Amino acid sequence: NIETERKLSAKEARAILAQAPGVQVYDNPSEKMYPLAVDAAGEDATYVGRIREDDTIPNGLNMWIVADNIRKGAALNAVQIAEELVRRDLLGVKDRTVFIKK
């Protein structure tokens, strides 16, 4: 679950997430449409579904989120490790601005 700064309805959250880069909203519980891990395998997108209000916390929402961990997790981790090696000057790269965001 997540807690937002202000109360959002599930409909508002769905609309916001639908506009987010790299996010695919796949959410129609009445038709049993929601993302499964198998849907995300080999894909760059993050899939979000089962978006609903969560009354257990203030301004809460529950949602189901799936992504390909190799593409999203491991790949990002590899980039972050490379950036840190460059930052520490451990790779002998002369122009570090190519790798490090300012």
Model-derived regions: residue spans:
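C-terminal substrate-binding/catalytic lobe of Rossmann-fold NAD(P)-dependent oxidoreductases
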Residues: 1-62
